[in-house]
Curated annotation (Swiss-Prot):
This is Isoflavone 4'-O-methyltransferase. Belongs to the class I-like SAM-binding methyltransferase superfamily. Cation-independent O-methyltransferase family. COMT subfamily. It is an enzyme of class 2 (transferase). 2-hydroxyisoflavanone 4'-O-methyltransferase involved in the biosynthesis of formononetin. Can use 2,7,4'-trihydroxyisoflavanone as substrate, but not daidzein. Its EC number is 2.1.1.46, 2.1.1.212. GO terms for biological process: isoflavonoid phytoalexin biosynthetic process; methylation. It comes from Lotus japonicus (Lotus corniculatus var. japonicus). It catalyses: a 4'-hydroxyisoflavone + S-adenosyl-L-methionine = a 4'-methoxyisoflavone + S-adenosyl-L-homocysteine + H(+); (2R,3S)-2,4',7-trihydroxyisoflavanone + S-adenosyl-L-methionine = (2R,3S)-2,7-dihydroxy-4'-methoxyisoflavanone + S-adenosyl-L-homocysteine + H(+).
């Protein structure tokens, strides 16, 4: 652009473009400020305080030195602007000067560790160096002639699953399992919204169900359903069930235990279409003896740029790049789900939005 001949409209456009560019360049600051708040336990302190807390009170509770109060204020200013804390004023008594205090908002309540809906492990996992460092190799990855190679593999020399399973007792594996368990607690919302989906089932297999967080919620809501958690042998090896909860080790790419329904929560987006098709066909085989009563229940993202608002669409597209770069997986649009489902031999499906940004997809033989 020739600045000497630019008009007011072009100047405004340039200014807005600069703001847009800088905002996205520095979005990482908001993420890291949130990570800092989570690691310090700011939401936990405010929750324990029982009411909005002043900066000096918060600094004392966090064992911060007085010299850090100004730093804490500036972090909270950004996080308050982003909706994670609410700013108010409190008075120490009649005639006393009012002080600024900070309270929780619905998003920061998701960071309170004593809450069953705590998502702090998600924040920890998503912003862990193992998730972020790979992006330094993105240009190298783009220039490599290997369609199957993920960005994670290009950067580290191993797949994410190999990295995760190197040590069955590793801190990274525990962190990943805790993140998946935390996300599973939000499944209670789905059970409330879609209770009818699970009514009438006699048995259910939760494929790649981890430690059984989701399965236990289903059993709690439907105690008559015989539930099986199906995952890799090393995941379920030391887990014990009971009469209506069984843990089975195996390989979902080879077979899936039979049941009235098969649950795939947060599974298919980890895999490309070819491998997802193999999983779905095995799930169809697992319910084949159940007649028209059998079904597969998928909980995953369904991208809909025409109906979703901008913020929701951006979140789903962010997730899509996470799946691509870490697993060579994908988040799918409705037409992609439809093709995958029909290619696996199913006759019909129904997509129902749940839990904010996920969808529940019922698939029928």
């Amino acid at each position: 652009m020739d600045f000497s001949s630019s008009n007011g409209s072009e100047d405004t456009e340039l200014s807005q473009a600069q703001i847009h560019l800088y905002k996205h360049v520095y979005n990482f600051v908001s993420s890291m400020a949130l990570k800092s708040a989570m690691e310090l336990g700011i939401a936990d302190v405010i929750h324990s305080h029982g009411k909005p807390i002043t900066l000096p009170e918060l600094a004392t509770a966090l064992n911060l030195r007085p010299s850090k109060i100004g730093v804490l204020h500036r972090f909270l200013r950004l996080l308050t602007h982003n909706g994670f804390f609410a700013k108010t004023t409190v008075s120490r008594g009649e005639g006393a000067e009012e002080e600024t205090a900070y309270g929780l908002t619905p998003p920061s309540k998701l960071l309170v560790k004593s809450n069953s809906t705590c998502l702090a492990p998600i924040v920890k996992g998503a912003l862990h160096p193992s998730s972020l460092d790979m992006w330094r190799s993105s240009k190298k990855w783009f220039l490599e002639d290997n369609e199957e190679l993920t960005l994670f593999e290009s950067a580290t020399g191993e797949s994410f699953w190999e990295f995760l399973n190197k040590e069955t007792e590793s801190d990274t594996l525990s962190m990943f399992q805790e993140a998946m368990a935390a996300d599973s607690h939000m499944f209670k919302l789905a059970l409330k919204e879609c209770k009818h989906v699970f009514e009438g089932l006699g048995s259910l297999v939760d494929v790649a169900g981890g430690r059984g967080g989701v399965t236990k919620l289903i059993r709690e809501a439907f105690p008559h359903v015989k539930c099986t958690v199906f995952d890799q042998p090393q995941v379920v090896a030391n887990l014990t069930g009971d009469e209506n909860l069984n843990f089975v080790g195996g390989d979902m790419f080879k077979s899936v235990p039979p049941a009235d329904a098969v649950l795939l929560k947060w599974v298919l987006h980890d895999w490309n279409d070819e491998l997802s098709l193999k999983i779905l066909k095995n799930c169809k085989e697992a319910i084949s003896g159940r007649g028209k009563e059998g079904k597969v229940i998928i909980i995953d993202i369904s991208i809909d740029e025409t109906s979703d608002d901008r913020e929701l669409t951006e979140l789903k597209l962010d997730y899509d790049l996470v799946m691509l770069t870490m697993f060579n997986g994908k988040e799918r649009e409705k037409k992609e789900w439809e093709k995958l489902i029909y290619d696996a031999g199913f006759s019909s499906y129904k997509i129902t939005p749940i839990c904010g940004f996920k969808s529940l997809i019922e698939v029928f033989p």
